[in-house]
Design a protein with these regions (language model features):
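Sec-dependent signal peptide recognition
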Residues: 5-12
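C-terminal motif of bacterial Sec signal peptides marking the signal peptidase cleavage site
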Residues: 16-17
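Conserved catalytic region of serine esterases and O-acyltransferases that act on ester linkages
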Residues: 20, 227-313
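N-terminal module-boundary/linker segments of secreted carbohydrate-active enzymes
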Residues: 23-65
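Soluble non-cytosolic domains of exported or imported proteins
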Residues: 40, 52-56, 133-138, 173-177, ...
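Conserved SGNH/GDSL esterase-like catalytic core that processes O-acyl groups on lipids
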Residues: 44-45, 56-139, 143
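Structured segments of extracytoplasmic/periplasmic soluble domains
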Residues: 52, 56, 61-69, 122, ...
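Alpha-helical cap/lid subdomain in secreted, periplasmic
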Residues: 104-248
Length: 313
């Protein structure tokens, strides 16, 4: 082998051993999203892959918002990583409990079937631990490539989430910073760097929507029926605050965000009295508060090109 080629090979091996991964520069990453997607012409079949921040209720709420014809399946776990969903020998915590419902479908089977118009992926949080220990960019790439190998026109999305309310860095601060430094700067920039995923992975920016809504909410005097961010999250059975899992009101915001991105439609005016997955009535926001939720969703989605939605002029 030529000495120069040998040196290059040795350098690549050394970088690989040090954890180096090819990464797109910010400008090149942004260029992937310069042309928006065309709006879907029919109801969608959506596959959700993730964990308890997807949960059973949110996709069912999305189905009600989208109306007749929309359908979904999912594979979930407790704090599940993209790696654990991909690798057959890596256990998925809470698999039996989270998937004990009629909408469960094996993830590989679903993606390989070509029957889904959209595949929505999300990663474990703490996101920096997922990146450090579970190779998030690699598995985002593998799932996107798998989906488009079996159906090239599949729309693949990354559902951006949030962190613990009591995060030491600050909840809003983490949501603000993590979009660029982790969701984009690690998962997208590295996961898409090889150019073999059949197109970009678009973003469902639920964390950004939650943050903007919380800022609107916590400006005095709040909104009808809500006064603080904690009221979007569930309470534990003993009455203490769950700092990461959403209640019905939080799930409604996230379902609206999915709707706006997937269907590229303004969610203002959509129903706000919905059912949970078990058929019971979900807790509903006040009508005026629901309107603000819907407006915030559309503001965020149409000012963030990585959603694939046409942006505001």
């Amino acid at each position: 082998m030529h000495p120069l080629r040998t040196a290059k090979l040795l350098l690549l091996l050394a970088l690989s051993a040090c954890g180096f991964q090819k990464s797109l520069p910010e400008e090149s990453l942004n260029q992937l999203y310069s042309t928006p997607l065309s709006p879907p012409e029919r109801p969608l079949r959506v596959f959700h892959l993730g964990h308890s921040l997807v949960n059973r209720n949110m996709p069912v709420m999305l189905e009600q918002l989208a109306g007749n014809g929309h359908d979904h399946r999912s594979q979930l776990g407790w704090g599940a990583t993209l790696q654990s969903h991909w690798e057959p020998d890596v256990p998925i915590n809470g698999f039996e409990q989270e998937n004990a419902h009629p909408r469960y479908q094996d993830a590989h089977e679903a993606v390989r079937s070509g029957r889904f118009d959209a595949v929505v992926l999300t990663e474990m949080v703490e996101i920096r631990e997922a990146i450090k220990y579970f190779d998030s960019p690699k598995y985002l790439r593998l799932w996107a490539r798998e989906a488009r190998t079996h159906r090239p026109d599949t729309r693949v999305y990354l559902y951006e989430t949030w962190h613990q309310l009591d995060d030491a860095e600050g909840w809003l601060q983490r949501v603000d910073k993590d979009l660029g430094r982790y969701w984009e700067g690690e998962l997208l920039a590295k996961g898409l760097a090889h150019g073999d995923t059949g197109g970009p992975v678009y973003v469902i920016p639920a964390g950004q929507v939650m943050a903007r809504f919380v800022r609107r909410l916590e400006q005095a005097p709040g909104l009808p029926g809500l006064s603080s961010r904690s009221e979007l999250f569930v309470r534990n059975p003993d009455g203490t605050q769950d700092n990461i899992h959403l209640n019905d009101l939080g799930n409604y915001i996230v379902a609206l965000t999915h709707y706006a991105v997937l269907y590229q439609r303004n969610p203002v005016g959509l129903p706000f009295r919905l059912k949970r997955a078990d058929g019971t009535d979900a807790d509903s926001p006040d009508e005026a508060t629901a309107r603000v939720m819907q407006e915030v969703v559309w503001e965020v989605v149409t000012t963030y090109p990585k959603t694939g939605v046409a942006q505001r002029p």
